[in-house]
Regions:
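Core AdoMet radical
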Residues: 1-72, 157-159
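Auxiliary Fe-S-binding modules of radical SAM enzymes
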Residues: 70-175
Length: 175
């Protein structure tokens, strides 16, 4: 990528669990960072992703991403440079979402984009965790959106509840 610069923005889509060293290695190569910011709660991060340090690692990684790309630039409805952070609101975990949004508000500026997703469908091993073995309630999602607005996020992608449909889950074949 250092030799070849494509005519379209280079996008780094990631889970947010990258080290600052990994992000530093990408400096000057990435136009748009698109990380997840899954957890502010270390207990949830430990239970669902076996990564109790996820909140601190993700916050540091996203801050490093923001420092590299600076102000988010959108032209003709297309992101050219910047930061688009995704967060999936989990059922029964609105406090986790509030914590993610609070942490993100310390990093982001008014140009950055937040994708607040409502598409959670209990699948796979969700039955092992009764607290997330259900769909998101409309009031939980509304509370999350309201908190984002209260914090001053101006560019928020929101979803209809119909996006939480098993039809959107790919068939994962085990080999």
């Amino acid at each position: 990528l250092r030799r070849y610069r494509p005519s379209v923005p280079t996008v780094w889509n990631c889970g947010g669990y990258e080290s600052e060293r990994q992000i530093a290695a990408l400096d000057g190569l990435i136009d748009v960072y698109m990380p997840d910011f899954k957890y502010s709660d270390p207990a949830a991060a430990a239970a669902y992703s076996n990564a109790p340090d996820y909140p601190e690692v993700a916050k540091a990684a996203i801050a490093a991403m923001k420092k590299q790309v600076g102000t988010t630039v959108v032209e003709n409805g297309k992101i050219k440079k910047g930061l688009l952070v995704r967060h999936l609101v989990l059922p029964g975990a609105v406090r986790n979402t509030f914590g993610v949004l609070d942490a993100l508000a310390e990093i982001a500026d008014g140009t950055d984009i937040l994708s607040l997703m409502s598409q959670y469908v209990p699948y796979g091993r969700a039955a092992e965790y009764p607290e997330i073995n259900r769909r998101l309630r409309p009031l939980e999602y509304k509370a999350a959106v309201a908190h984002a607005v209260r914090l001053g996020f101006a560019n928020v992608y929101v979803q209809e509840s119909s996006s939480a449909d098993e039809a959107y889950i790919p068939e994962f074949a085990r080999s």
